[in-house]
Design a protein with these regions (language model features):
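EAL-family c-di-GMP phosphodiesterase catalytic domain
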Residues: 6, 29-36, 48, 55-69, ...
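Structural preference for long, well-ordered alpha-helical segments in enzyme cores
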Residues: 1-12, 41-42, 75, 132, ...
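Short helix-capping segments at alpha-helix termini
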Residues: 15-20, 48-53, 79-82
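PAS/LOV-family and closely related PAS-like sensory domains
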Residues: 10-17, 21, 237-241
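Sensory modules in modular signal-transduction proteins
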Residues: 212-238
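PAS-family sensory domains
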Residues: 45-48, 103, 238-241
């Protein structure tokens, strides 16, 4: 676990020489969090690599049971004080409950794919996802929906306005060499194909965002009218318009 963290942070530092705002997320396990020196080890790792804390997100494996909230919150507080972002991975599985949102001091929850899959034809999951996102946002917690694989899922999720979307629809896992071709070599065919694919996805997102805005405006007008005790209609006496 610690080797993975150090290797990932070192790689992040290398890529930031090309992409200056590159950000990396690394899983951190319950076993690691229970190490006596974990707080200092993480801070020493980013210092040695020469990257700022805000270039790193530590994704806590959500399926584990974090019973000692005060202990873990002290660790998270120290990391966050140095700019490190804390996320709960696979939210909604294992020991998860909405109680995490009031007990653990995190910046982000990553909602598991089981809630995302075919959300466009599952009203229960859609309502549940909507409520989770609203509750998280009310606590100033960002939301990432994991496992987005189809344009239909993207369209439905856009209506719920999460902060981030993640999944094979946008990108699959890449090797170091593949990622560099896709994001750092502008002359490569892979880079150009990625840009075109992302442009099309952006168009889908923009169209859906406009539709949601229009729906919200209509709903607002309906709510105003329904909230009135009396509605007076004024029309032209000749044309009735």
């Amino acid at each position: 676990g610690n080797w993975v963290l150090k290797t990932a942070v070192k790689q992040c530092a290398d890529w930031r020489k090309v992409l200056t705002d590159f950000h990396i997320g690394v899983n951190i396990s319950y076993v690691q969090l229970c190490q006596d020196n974990i707080t200092e080890m993480v801070l020493d790792t980013i210092t040695e690599a020469g990257i700022p804390g805000d270039a790193l997100t530590l994704e806590v494996t959500e399926s584990m049971e974090l019973q000692d909230y005060s202990y873990f919150n002290k660790i998270f507080y120290e990391w966050k004080r140095h700019g490190i972002h804390i996320a709960i991975d696979d939210f909604g599985t294992g020991y998860s409950s909405l109680g995490y949102l009031k007990s653990i001091d995190v910046d982000e929850i990553k909602i598991d794919r089981c809630f995302v899959s075919r959300i466009y034809c599952n009203n229960y999951n859609y309502r549940l996802m909507s409520n989770i996102i609203k509750l998280a946002h009310s606590s100033q917690i960002q939301v990432c929906c994991e496992g987005v694989e189809t344009e239909e899922e993207l369209t439905s999720l856009q209506q719920l306005i999460p902060d981030f979307l993640q999944g094979f629809l946008f990108a699959k896992p890449y090797t170091k060499e593949e990622l560099e071709k896709l994001y750092m070599c502008k002359e490569s065919l892979e880079y150009q194909e990625r840009v075109e694919r992302e442009r099309k996805l952006y168009q889908i997102s923009t169209i859906e965002e406009k539709n949601v805005t229009a729906e919200n405006e209509r709903d607002e007008i309906v709510n105003i009218v329904e909230g009135m005790d009396e509605v007076i209609y004024v029309s032209d006496i000749d044309t009735y318009e």
